[in-house]
Amino acid sequence: MSYRELRNLCEMTRSLRYPRLMSIENFRTPNFQLVAELLEWIVKKFEPESNLDAHEVQTEADRVAFIKNAVLLMLQNSRIKMNPKKLYQADGHAVQELLPAMKILYQAKAEDPNTDNSPKWTQVKNKLSSKMQEVRITRQLSSQLPETGALLSELLSRQEFISQQHERAASRAVPLAEAEKVLQATVQNIAQETEQLSNKLNNVASDEAELDEKIERKKREYEQLQKRFAKLQSFRPQYMDEYERFEERLKKLYEVYVLNFRNLSYLRKVHDDLARSERQRQEELEKAMRMAVEKMRLEQEKKDAIGLHDDDGSDAPLVDRRQSVRKVYGNMMGGDASDDDEDDEDDEDDEIIRMDDNVAQHHKRELHRQEEDEERSEADYMVGITTAHVADDAKSDLSSGDDF
C-alpha cells in the first residue's frame, strides 16, 4: 500500500462518478462496509444482473460469502484475479486488489468514443463474429457426433459379414447358361412392363375423351335445369290467390279469438272478485250480527244484575217504609203502582223487540245490497256475452262462403 495507490483510487472513483465521496484517510483503518460497497459497485459495472447487496452483510459468515461471490464474478466476467484475504482486511491492502478493476473502467471511459469505427475495432468485431460462428458450428457438430458414432459402429459391426458375403460371391463361378436364362427373364419382364405402360397410356387417352363427353353432357343438363328453375321461380301457382285469401281470413279469425279469450279471462276475473267480495260481506254481516246479539245479551245481563243488586242491597226499614207508602198511596191511587211496574216491563220488552227489528232491518238492507250487486254483475256478464255474440257473428260472417 502506498500513498500513490490511495490517491489514484480516490481520483478514479471521483472521475467514474462513484456516488460516495472518498478520501485517503478512509483506508487508514479497516472499513469493511466501504470496501463492500465499492466492490459491489465495481461488480455491478461488469455484471449489471448480479445479486450482490452490501447492505445485507451483517455477520462474519455474510462477509465471507460476499467476498467469495464478488471474487468469483470478477473472475468469470473480466478475468481479474483478486485475493479474498486482502479484500477481507478492508484496509490499504484491499486497495491494491481493487485498483486493476478500477483501471479497466477508467481506461474504458478515457478512450475516444469514435474508436468503435476504427479499422482495428472492425477487425476485432469480425474476428469475434467468426469465432462465434465457429462456436455455433462446433455445438451443432457435437450434437451430431453421438449419432454419427453410433451409425459408424453399426456399419463396422456389419462390415465383417458383408466382406464374407462379397468373398463368397466373388469366388463362385457363374454358368453361362444360367446367366443367359436370368437375362432373358429380365428382358421379358421389362418388355411386359413396357407393354402394360403403353396400354395404360392408350386407355388414358380413351378415358380422357369419355370424360370430356360426360362433362359436356353434364353442362347441357345443368343449363336445362337452370332454365327450368328460372321458369318455376317466375310461375305463380293457381292456388296462391285462394291461399292468400284464406291467410287474411285466418288472421281476422285469430284476432277475434284473441278478443274472445281476453273477454273470457276478464269475466272470470270479475266473477272471482265478486265471489270473494260476497264471501267477505257475508263474513262481515255474520260478525256484525254476532256482535249485536252479544251486545244485547251483555246489556240484558247488566240490567238484570242491576235489578238484583237493588233488590238485595235495600235495607229493611226502607222496605217497610216503601211498603207503608205503597199502602198509603195505594189506597189513594188504586192500582197505579202495579200498573207502573208493568209499564216498565213492557218498555223493556219493547226495547228488546225494537233492537231485534233493527238487526232484522240491517240484515234486510245487506241482502238488498247483495241482490243489487248480483244484478249489476249479471248486467256486466250480459254485456260480455253480447260482445262475444257480436264477435261470433263477425266470425260467422267471415267464415261464410268457401271456408276451409
From Swiss-Prot:
Entry's family note: Belongs to the CLUAP1 family.
UniProt entry keywords in alphabetical sequence: Cell projection, Cilium, Cilium biogenesis/degradation, Coiled coil
Phenotype caused by lack of the gene: Cilia of at least eight pairs of amphid neurons from mutant dyf(m185) animals are truncated at a middle segment, and empty amphidial sockets were seen indicating cilium structural abnormalities.
One BP term from GO: chemosensory behavior
InterPro entries cross-referenced by the UniProt entry: Clusterin-associated_protein-1 (IPR019366)
Subcellular location: Cell projection, Axon; Cell projection, Cilium; Cell projection, Dendrite
Source organism (scientific name): Caenorhabditis elegans
Function summary: Component of the intraflagellar transport (IFT) complex B required for transport of proteins in the motile cilium. May be required for ciliary entrance and transport of specific ciliary cargo proteins such as che-3 which are related to motility. Required for sensory cilia biogenesis.
Protein name: Clusterin-associated protein 1 homolog
Coiled-coil features, chain-numbered ranges: 176-306
Binding partners and assembly: Component of the IFT complex B composed of at least che-2, che-13, dyf-1, dyf-3, dyf-6, dyf-11, dyf-13, ift-20, ift-74, ift-81, ifta-2, osm-1, osm-5 and osm-6.
Biased composition (Acidic residues): 337-351
Tissue: Expressed in a subset of sensory neurons including eight pairs of amphid neurons (ASE, ADF, ASG, ASH, ASI, ASJ, ASK and ADL), six inner labial neurons (IL2s) and two pairs of phasmid neurons (PHA and PHB).
Chain intervals for the UniProt region annotation (Disordered): 328-382
One CC-aspect GO term: microtubule organizing center
One Pfam family hit: Cluap1
Main location: other
